[in-house]
């Protein structure tokens, strides 16, 4: 479909058009000159540009990472040395070798999940061979000797 042609009889006369332009020039609406910004600082800081949110077409990792420190990964094995046996008998305390990355709260939760016992507190130390030892003090309503029997330490 071709554009509609303008009717030659409706063309405005040149005098009216010139008067219209003269009026616009006189008011100054056509000649707006942008003023130059005066720089007072020596260093030039690049202006901040628009940063769009990331919208990836596909995830960059194939599968979400699994939790490597579950209760089985935290508690490696119970310690059965003579001093550990003395702790079981005298202080109501179980001694475990635990993962180096495990903290006291995770150790406490792991013992609760594995053996269904409440712990009073957990003390940890890192041995010279680089492993972490945890002293798990049980609450008075649990006997460490019975728990050690159930676990199979004794």
From Swiss-Prot:
Region ranges (Disordered): 1-39
Molecular-function GO term, any one: mRNA binding
SUPFAM superfamilies: Ribosomal proteins S24e, L23 and L15e (SSF54189)
UniProt biased composition (Low complexity): 15-26
GO biological process terms held by the UniProt record: translation
Presence of keyword Protein biosynthesis: no
Pfam families: Ribosomal_L23 (PF00276), Ribosomal_L23eN (PF03939)
Residues annotated as signal peptide: none
Family under the similarity heading: Belongs to the universal ribosomal protein uL23 family.
HAMAP family, per database record: Ribosomal_uL23_A
Protein name (database record): Large ribosomal subunit protein uL23
Organism: Nicotiana tabacum (Common tobacco)
